[in-house]
From Swiss-Prot:
Main location (coarse class): endoplasmic reticulum
Keyword vocabulary terms for this entry: Endoplasmic reticulum, Heme, Iron, Membrane, Metal-binding, Monooxygenase, Oxidoreductase, Transmembrane, Transmembrane helix
Needed cofactors: heme
Pfam families per UniProt: p450
Gene3D superfamilies membership: Cytochrome P450
Lineage per the UniProt record: Eukaryota, Viridiplantae, Streptophyta, Embryophyta, Tracheophyta
Membrane topology type: Single-pass membrane protein
Binding site for heme: 470
Pathway listed: Alkaloid biosynthesis
Full protein name: Secologanin synthase 2
An example Gene Ontology CC term for this record: endoplasmic reticulum membrane
Species name: Catharanthus roseus
Family of this protein: Belongs to the cytochrome P450 family.
Gene that this sequence comes from: SLS2
Keyword Endoplasmic reticulum: yes
Top EC class, one word: oxidoreductase
């Protein structure tokens, strides 16, 4: 009997030992052998980069370079790549265009050839979003149709698309105009007292565009929308911290201060949105007409999709899905337009000849009247200026995908588990595409449209390209055109003496040390 127990104990011990060894091997394979195998395959195909460092990869080196780059402002020019992505810039200069870096244990190749870029963006089912390599809590913010793949992405995009048709955008214009009118009227009153008015424009446009989103997304529930925006701003700051860290699986479950706060904010936002959505759904079921805002259009489109699918439970979006899309409306819509208006104002301050050209065009089209949709879309100089600002200061500095199986890309076979980065801010400065003046602000390059400016290459990516091109790009451009036109009708502007040129990236490209601009009322009132 005693011998039997001894055998059992040894068997249990042997089993535990075997399980521990199997687990240790899996961890070692995940953390060391797999990255080294991928590195070997990349090097065999001519890719070059730093050797893999256990778990951290290039994170420490990249972080140090990033800190150094941001510690000092720069001259006012558009050579912002060394400041925004110093480690990528250093790697490409050191190892060439066919190079790779390490995001922890994940290798990331840089793709800069137009034909390969087109291939990546055309085959979105192979080259997918890479949110899975981050802390899962990142998905509290980076969610919705932009983060989905496959059938779920296709269904969500189909349901959401009706909210962004030209007809719907046209109906949003009055709400845009009210928000801009209220802000500019305040500026005029302050400028009348003091002769001019100095504004830190990025936070001002940030709040303004959030007001616009609140109005067009939630209509009559605008006040609740404002509260959601404030919580989302805090969630964005915490999300950025998460994305800068090397993610260790399971870390999101630990009760750290940041993890707890992110979960609290997400619950609060989710509860508020659920209340708004349930109220709308009850009204629709009671036969009341839907509201003509983004949420109203989304809910009606969702009901139609469910009916088309034979009222199947999984035929449309769930309430939770709608909540995630509302978060995306807020974050993407507000951030993109806010930074676009900010950099447009700064660049037009530095190029007064283009400011004057745009103003003359706006005044000829509208005089002092409120801009209207049809003619707004035919403002050639204003459109060219916005395209050029998006080239030099795109909202996001790169598009990064991940592949989950070995994938042929041009002459290369990219190993599964590799990230593929399209460095947008670099591509937008390629002299072979844009000419010798690629670093200069020259809206004339877009006089004959984007295709002509890029020589029909897929190298202009402020809103991505292909099947996953940003649904809201026309929303952002229309709002920016209206805002810029209304500002030009009333003010001349120049950067304040205190302005320091220091672009940096917090999800989007923003001014690091403020964005102070001086506005002076136009003397000419009889247009």
């Amino acid at each position: 009997m005693e011998m039997d127990m001894d055998i059992i104990r040894k068997a249990i011990a042997a089993t535990i030992f075997a399980l521990v060894m199997a687990w240790a091997w899996r961890v070692l394979d995940w953390a060391w052998f797999t990255p080294k195998r991928i590195e070997k395959r990349l090097r065999q195909q001519g890719f070059r980069g730093n050797p893999y460092r256990f778990l951290v990869g290039d994170v420490k080196e990249s972080g140090k370079m990033h800190q150094e780059a941001l510690s000092n402002p720069m001259e006012f020019d558009n050579d912002i790549v060394p400041r925004l992505m110093p480690h990528i810039n250093h790697t490409i200069k050191t190892y060439g265009r066919n190079s790779f870096t390490w995001m922890g244990r994940i290798p990331r190749i840089h793709v800069m050839e137009p034909e390969l870029i087109k291939e990546v963006l055309t085959h979105s089912s192979k080259y997918q979003k890479n949110f899975d390599v981050h802390n899962p809590l990142v998905k509290f913010l980076l969610t919705g149709v932009g983060s989905f793949e496959g059938a779920k992405w296709s269904k969500h995009r189909r349901i959401i698309s009706p909210a962004f048709t030209l007809e719907k955008l046209k109906s949003m214009l009055p709400a845009f105009a009210i928000c801009y009118h209220d802000m500019l009227t305040k500026w005029e009153k302050l400028a009348e007292k003091e002769g001019s008015h100095e504004v830190d424009i990025f936070p001002t446009f940030d709040v303004l565009t959030s007001d616009v989103i609140s109005k067009v997304a939630f209509g009559s529930t605008y006040d609740e929308g404002g509260k959601i925006f404030r919580l989302l701003k805090e969630l964005m700051d915490l999300t950025i911290d998460c994305m800068r860290d090397v993610y260790i699986p399971g870390w999101s479950y630990l009760p750290t201060k940041r993890n707890k706060r992110m979960k609290e904010i997400n619950k609060e936002i989710t509860d508020m949105l659920r209340f708004i959505i349930n109220k709308r759904m009850k009204a629709l079921k009671a036969g009341e007409p839907g509201e003509d805002d983004l949420l109203g259009v989304l809910l009606e489109s969702n009901i139609q999709e469910i009916q088309k699918q034979g009222n199947r439970k999984d035929g449309g979006m769930t309430i939770n899905d709608v909540i995630e899309e509302c978060k995306l409306f807020y974050f993407a819509g507000q951030e993109t337009t806010g930074v676009l208006l900010t950099w447009t104002t700064i660049l037009l301050s530095k190029h007064p000849e283009w400011q004057e050209r745009a103003r003359e065009e706006v005044l000829q089209a509208f005089g002092k009247n409120k801009p209207e949709f049809e003619r707004l879309n035919h403002l050639k100089y204003v459109s060219m200026i916005l395209y050029e600002v998006l080239r030099l200061y795109p909202p996001v500095i790169d598009l990064t995908k991940i592949i989950h199986e070995d994938t042929k890309l041009g002459p290369y076979t990219i190993p599964a588990g590799t990230q593929v980065m399209l460095p947008t801010v670099m591509l937008h400065r390629e002299k072979s595409i844009w000419g010798e003046d690629a670093m200069e602000f020259n809206p004339m390059r877009f006089a004959d449209g984007v295709a002509n400016a890029t020589k029909n290459n897929v190298t202009y990516l402020p809103f991505s390209w292909g099947p996953r091109v940003c649904l809201g790009q026309n929303f952002a451009l229309l709002q920016a055109k209206l805002g810029l036109a209304m500002i030009l009708q009333r003010f001349k502007f120049d950067v304040a003496p205190s302005y320091v040129h220091a672009p940096f990236t917090i999800l989007t490209v923003q001014p690091q040390f403020g964005s102070h601009v001086i506005y002076k009322k136009l003397e000419r009132q009889n247009f």
